[in-house]
Amino acid sequence: MAGPVKDREAFQRLNFLYQAAHCVLAQDPENQALARFYCHTERTIAKRLVLRRDPSVKRTLCRGCSSLLVPGLTCTQRQRRCRGQRWTVQTCLTCQRSQRFLNDPGHLLWGDRPEAQLGNQADSKPLQPLPNTAHSISDHLPEEKMQIQGSSDQ
């Protein structure tokens, strides 16, 4: 069970702005400027408060003009092959900026991997404490005294 979320109100505001942009485009596809304003506001709030957004949300926003990327309406999607790998290329129709995403069914995003989950980190073996390399001066003094006394006897 998840604990309390830090900046819960900010995440709710981001969610509202993202949904509002979707609703505006769904009702009137010509009203892209208002949807872009909502997305730009959402992006600036997330940057100002240093909040990490989900990759699926970031992939639906243009990094150049903050437009909401809806295939066939505000962007084009093409499947390309490059060096044996399949890529999905999204091109924004407003600013012509393109983004490439790996189209591999076996690929997992970092957040979806088991080692990225906080619950699994607690299950792994605990970190071993580092050995104390700082020795006190008194640990070395008796050896030095013995060496000095032994050398003066000779």
Swiss-Prot record:
Task: From the UniProt entry, list the residue stretches annotated as the region Disordered.
Answer: 112-154
User: Which keywords, in A-to-Z order, does the entry hold?
Assistant: Acetylation, Metal-binding, Nucleus, tRNA processing, Zinc
Judging by the UniProt lineage, the source's domain of life is Eukaryota
GO MF, one example? ribonuclease P activity
Gene3D superfamilies per UniProt: 6.20.50.20
Query: Residues that bind Zn(2+), according to the entry?
Result: C62, C65, C92, C95
Q: Which residues carry this modification: N-acetylalanine?
A: A2
GO biological processes? tRNA processing
Q: State the compartments where it is located.
A: Nucleus, Nucleolus
Q: Which InterPro entries match?
A: Rpr2/Snm1/Rpp21
What is known about what this protein does? Component of ribonuclease P, a ribonucleoprotein complex that generates mature tRNA molecules by cleaving their 5'-ends.
The protein here is known as: Ribonuclease P protein subunit p21
